[in-house]
């Protein structure tokens, strides 16, 4: 965006390893001011995407091999579909269960096909997703669109699966003073990050591939920074 001889670039939510949706690379762009995704901020020890996926799939595979169902609390949009593609690719025989929000999002992929990578569209269109059973626990992976476990129905499901030896894996930010954080701090859940945003290191790497006079690192409400980097 340019006005009065000055230009602004806004990345929006951006991660250059996006799995499901097509994206344009942020390279070779000139702007006086750039607002770049830095939602994960100065997170320490952030592994590469490949390492993150390997760790997550290994944890899921190990739990299933032990007869333990896995529940993945994810946001309503984005991250869950990406994780599902890796399960389909690496653990193709796994039964998948999901709440209505996740199933609805999956159903919308046909309507948004122009934004979805063709290979992902083909992979997910052939995957049968079951509704979460209410009267028994089956072995498989459960997607629930409730990342902080705010819904009482989600918490009841988690309790039911934990009683049966299930494993809860969070893959994104666990916000403080939530039911998710209580479960994590009690040692009844695990955090294995699956990145969908940039860390500060990612943001600076992307900035180095462009020509921005000034950068504002855009963060979430839980890690607010207004620091401006001069480059």
Predicted feature descriptions by range:
Residues 1-23, 65, 133-135, 139-141, ...:
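Core dinuclear metal-dependent hydrolase active-site scaffold
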Residues 19-21, 44-45, 105-111, 178-180:
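Short, charged, surface-exposed secondary-structure boundary motifs
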Residues 56-171, 176, 208-211, 218:
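Hard-cation-handling environments
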């Amino acid at each position: 965006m340019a006005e009065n001889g000055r230009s602004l670039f806004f990345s929006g939510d951006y991660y250059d390893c996006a799995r499901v949706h097509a994206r344009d690379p942020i390279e070779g762009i000139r702007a006086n001011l750039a607002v770049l995704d830095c939602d994960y901020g100065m997170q320490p020890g952030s592994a590469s995407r490949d390492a993150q996926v390997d760790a997550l799939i290994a944890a899921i595979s190990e739990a299933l091999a032990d007869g333990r169902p896995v529940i993945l609390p994810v946001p309503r949009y984005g991250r869950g579909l990406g994780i599902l593609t890796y399960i389909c690719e690496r653990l193709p025989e796994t039964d998948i269960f999901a709440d209505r929000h996740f199933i609805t999002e999956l159903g919308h992929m046909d309507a948004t096909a122009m934004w979805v990578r063709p290979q992902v569209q083909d992979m997910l269109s052939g995957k049968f997703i079951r509704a979460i059973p209410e009267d028994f626990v089956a072995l498989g992976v459960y997607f629930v669109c409730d990342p902080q476990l705010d819904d009482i129905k989600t918490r009841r499901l988690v309790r039911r699966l934990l009683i049966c030896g299930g494993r809860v894996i969070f893959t994104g930010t666990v916000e403080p003073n939530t039911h998710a954080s209580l479960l994590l701090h009690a040692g009844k859940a695990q955090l294995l990050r699956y990145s969908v945003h940039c860390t500060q290191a990612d943001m600076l790497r992307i900035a180095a591939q462009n020509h921005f006079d000034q950068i504002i690192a855009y963060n979430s409400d839980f890690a607010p920074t207004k620091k401006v980097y001069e480059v």
